[in-house]
């Protein structure tokens, strides 16, 4: 509170940081309550304004929860992580004195309910006395801003025993996460405070209702955190999932906002609904909906259910919790970024921030009380969910293959979500069905991973690993496919029974994705100090023939060989940044007792002083194989001219208005936190010859209409820069916008020509007479909503180095699995190279696509490289970094950025 004296309060066990509360607030509270019975402070007491009068930034939210914990024995606050910008992530536990006294026992019994081996009788015994765990998550989209306001209101209500919550804490312990995305929230709140006048303007045309790019929806790295639950790429998600097994909630609510002209949405969900959910999940979705409806009806508030917001894609804040046993639900309040503090709807109703927070508050109350009133049934159903896990599903075997780092990365992603993984201590045989092949008796090597279907996170594991998830509707809110073995390029099989193979728990796997610690690179240029990496003592292992036991280089060694892969690229980038030298060999060969693929890195001794020290600093020691001679058994010798002398390119990444925020964020995060290379974000509105001159590589993420116009306007400058030696790498919408510059014809250009020739066809009349549902289905199918395909790869092309995998273990590493969305593909031409393309007789592996779109993709290019003067343009039909989880597509992208200037 401005002008007030503040008192620093020592924090007790109920809060993990120091809380600053205005002195007048404390004095008034102390006078109003007898010693030892201090009334919990309201948000207004601590913040100095009533909820809804102004936006509360995250620092103020933290201050309120700390003050509440300091004043109430029922509330404790824990910092469970921090955001990309260093803001704390909070979990507030609100529980009765009795529940607090036996909290460890409550949570242990709750965890026992997740064990598939817990009997129905034992579950009933636990359910008779244990409270339910209700987890309320607010503000995963930072500009859906009423959520965090409602979190404070709800916490205060629980702490003071507000009317309507009688008995709530006897039947439940409540966990409140007041802001899942503090960085996005403060981006929005900070802008709004600057944009509004002395009083809020409710006219929707006013500036304060038009949030600028990139918006507060996203986190620091511009990721949509409500798509990240199942991939755990972002620090906020990873920190939250690390706490999940402590709580194992029976109920999880994800509070959102939608169009300010809408009403309020709560469950039951719309179709499609993931088939992994048992009737327990559906039944309780309806029961919570009934409870919310009664609360809203009593107040005359409008709402709707089951019309939108499905429960299919596993990365949502309702779907993922539901896959691990909670009744996960999305609640959507009218409002969002355009609502501000007050907005006039098209029906003339004035919608205020306080209204929006109040609706979330009441929905939260109703949800808690529905859980409390049905506590016993809820807990027994929770136990049954886990007891029946794996009843109809087989276990999944993951084969490490030629590049074990792929399987290790996949295992790390699963383990981070609490999935148990085992590893075979010896080779074995089993009857197994290949995910993209047929069933047969097969041999599997030692080191094969097994993911059991019957385990606490079994339904989640099955959903993430199965080759295709059944879609029970004609439309999905998001992508229609995601199978992780395809995403990582890992051979996968389904097996029933338990083949003997000396199975043990797989060791924890350090993920490559996002593991570069923040605070390293500060700009472009190879002279900068390298960034700090998490787990520096651990070298990655790139192939089964190399590892930490590989012999040290002898005095006569000519250097080291490193097989291509993502871990190799990161290590080589470190080496180059530190002044070392590496060479990429253009063809495969045999040396040092094994075969090496095209794209293998040679780290020559003659060009690297203190070679072993350089390898250790780059994290390459465990992956490097020493070679004592430059001669090879088969193929070119190491000194061949068929090679590429590498240097770390100066990289620019297009950013700003017109660039897709999430696409930009994926590239930013990949370059900074996964690959660990320096780069500059280049303002889109300043493209020109001068702006491009400092760079060897310019990356163009997906763009919107205004971004396309920006690129069109900069066409001459971009063309001149490429012809002078620049490498232009563009993906998805950015590639579509730059195809004309590269003189690459898009498939849709050909189709547009065909449509002009067919204008007036009878089919147009039939299309015009389609019913509404048929139109919606056709529109969705035409969009290609995230469908998995197997592409043919040119393994000799530099863009394909290290990227190819075999199909169903056939041994030929000439395939690439991609998640294709939209209608972009390129017409092959002799004037440029097609490094990856859709084959003839194309069929989707997983997901939805119309027959017409399927045929239009056959024998069309997905990844092309076009030489222009001394430079080149590289175009990807999709964004290979989409949501930063399609690991198999990272390699061709890294090749484009780091090898592109050299080949």
Q: Residue ranges of each PLM-predicted region?
A:
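Conserved beta-strand positions
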Residues: 254-255, 700
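Intrinsic-disorder/low-complexity accessory segments
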Residues: 38-145, 149-173, 221, 227, ...
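Aromatic- and acidic-residue-enriched carbohydrate-binding clefts of CAZyme catalytic domains
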Residues: 203-223, 764
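Aromatic- and acidic-residue-enriched segments that line the glycan-binding/catalytic groove
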Residues: 186-202
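Short, solvent-exposed turn/loop segments enriched in Gly/Ser/Thr/Pro and often Arg
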Residues: 177-182, 192, 255-262, 734-735
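Short, conserved secondary-structure transition motifs
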Residues: 169-188, 785
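Bacterial N-terminal signal peptides
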Residues: 22-34
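N-terminal secretory signal peptides that target proteins for export/translocation
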Residues: 1-20
């Amino acid at each position: 509170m401005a002008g007030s004296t503040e008192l620093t309060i020592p924090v007790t066990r109920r809060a993990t940081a120091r809380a600053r509360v205005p002195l007048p607030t404390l004095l008034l509270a102390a006078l109003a309550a007898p010693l030892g019975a201090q009334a919990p402070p309201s948000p207004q007491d601590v913040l100095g304004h009533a909820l809804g009068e102004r936006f509360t930034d995250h620092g103020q939210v933290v201050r309120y929860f700390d003050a509440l914990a300091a004043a109430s024995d029922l509330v404790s606050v824990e910092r469970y992580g921090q955001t990309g910008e260093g803001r704390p992530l909070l979990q507030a536990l609100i529980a009765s004195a009795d529940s607090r006294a036996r909290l460890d026992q409550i949570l242990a019994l709750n965890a026992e309910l997740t064990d598939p081996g817990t009997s129905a009788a034992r579950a009933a015994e636990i359910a008779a006395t244990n409270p339910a765990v209700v987890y309320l998550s607010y503000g995963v989209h930072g500009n859906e801003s009423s959520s965090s306001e409602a979190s404070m209101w709800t916490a205060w209500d629980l702490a003071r025993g507000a009317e309507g919550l009688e008995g709530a804490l006897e039947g439940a312990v409540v966990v409140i996460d007041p802001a899942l995305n503090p960085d996005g929230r403060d981006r929005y709140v900070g802008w709004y405070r600057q944009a509004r006048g002395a009083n809020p303007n409710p006219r929707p045309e006013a500036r304060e209702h038009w949030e600028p790019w990139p918006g507060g929806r996203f986190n620091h790295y511009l990721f949509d955190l409500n798509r990240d639950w199942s991939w755990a790429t972002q620090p906020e998600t990873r920190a939250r999932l690390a706490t999940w097994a402590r709580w194992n909630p029976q109920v999880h609510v994800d509070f959102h906002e939608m169009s300010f002209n809408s009403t309020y949405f709560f469950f039951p969900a719309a179709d499609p609904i993931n088939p992994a959910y048992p009737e327990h999940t559906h039944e309780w979705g309806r029961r919570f909906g009934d409870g919310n409806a009664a609360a809203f009806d009593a107040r005359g508030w409008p709402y709707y259910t089951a019309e939108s917001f499905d429960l299919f894609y596993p990365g949502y804040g309702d779907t993922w919790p539901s896959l691990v046993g909670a009744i996960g639900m999305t609640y959507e309040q009218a409002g969002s970024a355009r609502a501000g503090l007050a907005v006039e709807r098209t029906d003339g109703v004035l919608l205020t921030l306080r209204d929006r927070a109040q609706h979330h508050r009441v929905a939260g109350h109703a949800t808690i009380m529905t859980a409390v009133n049905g506590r016993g049934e809820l807990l027994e159903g929770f136990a049954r969910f886990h007891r029946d896990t794996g009843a109809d599903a087989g276990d999944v075997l993951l084969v490490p293959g030629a590049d074990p780092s792929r399987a290790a990365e996949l295992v790390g992603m699963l383990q981070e979500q609490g999935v148990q993984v085992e590893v075979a201590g010896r080779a074995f045989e089993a009857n197994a069905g290949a995910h993209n092949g047929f069933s047969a008796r097969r041999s599997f090597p030692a080191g094969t991973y097994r993911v059991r279907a019957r385990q606490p996170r079994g339904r989640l594991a099955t959903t993430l690993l199965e080759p295709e998830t059944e879609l029970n509707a004609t439309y999905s809110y998001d992508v229609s496919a995601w199978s992780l073995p395809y995403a990582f390029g890992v051979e996968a099989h389904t097996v029933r029974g338990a083949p003997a193979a000396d199975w043990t728990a797989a060791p924890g796997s350090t993920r490559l994705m996002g593991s570069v610690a923040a605070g390293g690179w500060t700009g472009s240029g190879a002279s900068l100090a390298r960034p700090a990496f998490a787990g520096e003592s651990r070298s990655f292992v790139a192939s089964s023939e190399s590892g930490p036991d590989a012999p040290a280089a002898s005095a006569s060694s000519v250097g080291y060989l490193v097989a291509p892969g993502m871990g190799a690229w990161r290590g080589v980038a470190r080496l180059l940044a530190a002044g070392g030298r590496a060479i990429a060999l253009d063809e495969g060969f045999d040396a040092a007792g094994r075969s090496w693929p095209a794209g293998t890195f040679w780290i020559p001794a003659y060009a690297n002083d203190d070679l072993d020290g350089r390898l250790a600093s780059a994290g390459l020691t465990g992956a490097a194989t020493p070679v004592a001679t430059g001669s090879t058994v088969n193929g070119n010798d190491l000194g061949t001219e068929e090679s590429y002398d590498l240097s770390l390119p100066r990289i620019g990444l297009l950013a700003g208005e017109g660039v897709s925020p999430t696409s930009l964020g994926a590239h930013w995060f990949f370059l900074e936190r996964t690959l660990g290379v320096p780069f500059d974000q280049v303002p889109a509105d300043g493209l020109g010859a001068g702006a491009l001159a400092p760079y060897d590589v310019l990356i163009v993420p997906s763009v919107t209409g205004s971004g396309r116009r920006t690129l069109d306007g900069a066409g001459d400058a971009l063309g001149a820069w490429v012809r002078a030696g620049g490498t232009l790498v563009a993906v998805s919408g950015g590639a579509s916008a730059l195809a004309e510059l590269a003189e690459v014809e898009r498939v849709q250009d050909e189709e547009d020509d065909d449509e002009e020739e067919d204008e007036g066809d009878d089919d147009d009349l039939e299309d015009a007479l389609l019913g509404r549902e048929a139109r919606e289905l056709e529109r969705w199918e035409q969009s290609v909503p995230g469908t998995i395909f197997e592409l043919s790869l040119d393994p000799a092309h530099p863009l394909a180095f290290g990227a190819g995998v075999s199909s169903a273990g056939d041994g030929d590493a000439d395939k690439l699995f991609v998640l294709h969305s939209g209608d972009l593909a390129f017409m092959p031409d002799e004037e440029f190279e097609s490094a990856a393309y859709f084959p003839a007789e194309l069929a989707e592996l997983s997901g939805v696509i119309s027959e017409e779109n399927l045929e239009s993709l056959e024998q069309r290019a997905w990844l092309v490289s076009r030489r222009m003067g001394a430079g080149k343009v590289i175009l990807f039909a999709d964004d290979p970094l989409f949501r930063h989880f399609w690991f198999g597509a990272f390699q061709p992208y890294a090749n484009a950025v780091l090898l592109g200037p050299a080949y």
